[in-house]
C-alpha cells in the first residue's frame, strides 16, 4: 500500500516538474524576445557615427542637438548631464552616473531570471529523473513479472526530465550572455560619450 502511494506521488511530482520546465522554457523565450526588441529599439547599435558628429560640434547647443537626434537611452543619459547651464565636467559626470543607475536596472530586467533558470534548470530536471527512478523501483515491487524491463523502461522515461532540464538551461545561459553583451556595450557607449564631450573643454 505504501509502495503504491510512493509510486503515485513520484509519478505526479515528476509530471509537475516537467510542466514547470516547459513553463520555464516558454518564459525564457518570451523574456529574451522582449529584451532583444527592447535593446534594438532603445540602445545604440553603432557609436562611430555619433562620435563623428560630436567631434564636429563646437558648443553645448550643437552637442545637445546631435544627442537629441540620436534618440537612444545612452544619449538621453548624457542629455540629463548637460541640463545644467553652469555645470562643471565633474558635476556632468556625476549627474550621468546618478541617472545611469535606474536606467541600468531597466536594461538588466529579466537578466536575473534568465541566469537563475540557466543555473538551476538542470537540477530541476535531475530531481524529475530521481523521482522517475523512484517510481520505477516502486513499480518493480508491485509487479510480479517484468523484472529489469520494468525498471529500464521507467529509467528511460525518467531521463527525459534531465534532457528537458538541459534543453531549458542551455538557451537560458546563451540568452543571459547575449543580454550581458548588450548591457556592457551600452555602458561603454555612455563612458565613451562622456569622454568625448569632456575632451572638448566646453565646461
Which residues does each predicted region cover?
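Predominantly long cytosolic amphipathic alpha-helical stalk/bundle segments
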Residues: 42-146, 174-203
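Hydrophobic alpha-helical transmembrane segments of polytopic membrane proteins
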Residues: 158-174
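Residue-level micro-sites within transmembrane alpha helices that shape
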Residues: 14, 27, 33-34, 118-121, ...
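Residue-level signal for the membrane-embedded core of alpha-helical transmembrane segments
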Residues: 20-27, 121-124, 128-131, 166
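Hydrophobic side chains within alpha-helical segments
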Residues: 28-31, 37-38, 106, 160, ...
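Alpha-helical membrane-interface segments at transmembrane helix boundaries
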Residues: 7-14, 101-118, 149-160
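Hydrophobic membrane-targeting segments
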Residues: 1-50
